[in-house]
């Protein structure tokens, strides 16, 4: 089994070997003190589990824990060179990150633990539990708050009798959140039909404006601002309401376009259930 080598950057004290989410054996400190979480959701989880003093650096994307993040002075990019500058004893990354970047870090003896990106609420809880174990931290409060959110969502949805609404998740890239996506899992808790899934779209597909017209949803959910670095402007309710081609769509005619916080709805951290509460309140508002 290939580990990360016995000598590691910034590692002091006892270490042990663990197998990460991709099956790679990684030597990690028993009590990591220079953690670098990569990606906004990883930061959400890590900075909610441990004191910011144990976090060596964070990235540059907006996360859901700005106060804790402000206590972390260093900012890094997900490259070996950038990582070496902060001497981490544990780097946590999701498996959607470039294998080349991960390989490069490992070649530099940086201990990288890769976790499998969750696509459901239950998988998100499992990842939080996995990271908590790695950091010797308790995830009890975080999981309890997610469960409380899910209970709130269930209570709101159960008060609604009659036809379940058809909901579309629409971003500046088009109709999204198809079958197998995180949003698709959320719709099961919200007790709504998913427009993108009904049209046969998958987790990474983007449907067109024509698809939105064809779906004719009762409700359209749009993220407040999407994670975008290419300067594309996020979709807005005003833009949809004023589009002549969309006037026949039920959600437009009935003014049922709702905004949800993108850093919550697009996360797979404990904040995803906050987005679900917000969506439930909007979907079932009179």
Per-segment meaning from a language model:
Residues 2-41, 138-168, 282-286:
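Bacterial Sec-exported substrate-binding components of ABC uptake systems
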Residues 79-93, 110, 208-225:
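Proline-aspartate-enriched helix->loop->beta-strand connector
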Residues 123-135, 139, 224-286:
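Structured C-terminal subdomain patch of bacterial secreted/periplasmic proteins
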Residues 39, 95-96, 117, 219, ...:
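Short secondary-structure boundary segments
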Residues 34-86, 90-95, 195:
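A short, structured surface patch at a secondary-structure boundary
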Residues 60-64, 176-204:
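Alpha-helical, coiled-coil/dimerization segments enriched in small aliphatic residues
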Residues 19-23, 71-81, 200-209:
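Short helix-initiation/N-cap motifs at beta->coil->alpha
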Residues 100, 116-130, 162-186, 230-231:
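Extracytoplasmic ligand-binding site segments that recognize negatively charged/polar headgroups
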């Amino acid at each position: 089994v290939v580990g990360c080598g016995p000598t590691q950057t910034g590692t002091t004290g006892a270490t042990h070997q663990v197998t990460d989410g991709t099956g790679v054996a990684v030597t990690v400190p028993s009590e990591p003190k220079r953690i670098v979480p990569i990606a906004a959701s990883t930061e959400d989880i890590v900075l909610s589990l441990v004191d910011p003093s144990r976090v060596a650096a964070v990235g540059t994307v907006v996360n859901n824990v700005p106060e804790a993040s402000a206590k972390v002075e260093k900012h890094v990019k997900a490259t070996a060179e950038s990582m070496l500058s902060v001497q981490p004893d544990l780097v946590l990354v999701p498996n959607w990150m470039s294998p080349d970047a991960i390989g490069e870090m490992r070649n530099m003896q940086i201990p990288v633990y890769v976790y499998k990106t969750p696509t459901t609420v239950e998988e998100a809880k499992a990842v939080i539990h996995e990271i908590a174990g790695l950091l010797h931290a308790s995830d009890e409060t975080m999981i309890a708050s997610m469960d409380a959110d899910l209970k709130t969502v269930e209570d709101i949805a159960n008060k609604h009798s009659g036809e379940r609404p058809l909901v579309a998740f629409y971003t500046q890239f088009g109709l999204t959140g198809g079958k197998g996506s995180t949003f698709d899992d959320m719709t099961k808790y919200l007790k709504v039909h998913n427009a993108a899934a009904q049209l046969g779209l998958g987790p990474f597909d983007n449907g067109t404006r024509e698809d939105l017209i064809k779906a004719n949803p009762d409700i359209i959910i749009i993220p407040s601002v999407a994670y975008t670095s290419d300067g594309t402007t996020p979709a807005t309710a005003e833009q949809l309401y004023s589009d002549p081609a969309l006037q026949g769509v039920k959600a437009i005619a009935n003014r049922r376009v709702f905004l949800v916080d993108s850093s919550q709805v697009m996360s797979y951290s404990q904040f995803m259930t906050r987005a679900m509460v917000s969506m439930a309140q909007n979907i079932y508002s009179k």
